[in-house]
Amino acid sequence: MARVKRAVNAHKKRRVILERAAGYRGQRSRLYRKAKEQVTHSLVYAYRDRRAKKGEFRRLWIQRINAAARANGLTYNRLIQGLSLAGVQVDRRILAELAVHEPATFASLVQTAKAALPANTSAPKVAANA
């Protein structure tokens, strides 16, 4: 059986790892073993954070909607409840965009939600200053 020489493949494998590690600090960009460990961890972080990003954006949208809703006299949960009762199907991303870029349109959605809510539920609770 013929002998297999691995020099070309080994050099290519190491070069690919070191290219991926370009820009890392210190030994992590220059030494193969350290670079390999860091590239592996970086791929794990990237995989994890691609999934975490979705939740982070949802939380950001909810904060923006809540701030704009409170400026219009409703809390976030009452706004969502009112829109649901009114049959308005707008997702949180679009609501947040409207709240930031088109306040008049968002205010009309708040009025629609207020009209759909039962009585005595549209006013947000005010914290008592004791």
Curated annotation (Swiss-Prot):
Keyword Repressor part of the UniProt annotation: no
Keywords, comma-separated and alphabetical: Ribonucleoprotein, Ribosomal protein, RNA-binding, rRNA-binding
InterPro entries membership: Ribosomal_bL20 (IPR005813), RIBOSOMAL_L20_CS (IPR049946), Ribosomal_protein_bL20_C (IPR035566)
SUPFAM superfamilies cross-referenced by the UniProt entry: Ribosomal protein L20 (SSF74731)
Domain of life: Bacteria
Any one GO molecular function term: rRNA binding
Gene Ontology cellular component list: ribonucleoprotein complex; ribosome
Name of one Pfam family that matches: Ribosomal_L20
Biological processes per GO annotation: ribosomal large subunit assembly; translation
Cross-referenced HAMAP family: Ribosomal_bL20
Protein task: Binds directly to 23S ribosomal RNA and is necessary for the in vitro assembly process of the 50S ribosomal subunit. It is not involved in the protein synthesizing functions of that subunit.
Family: Belongs to the bacterial ribosomal protein bL20 family.
Identification of the protein by name: Large ribosomal subunit protein bL20
Species whose genome carries this gene: Clavibacter michiganensis subsp. michiganensis (strain NCPPB 382)
Protein encoded by which gene: rplT
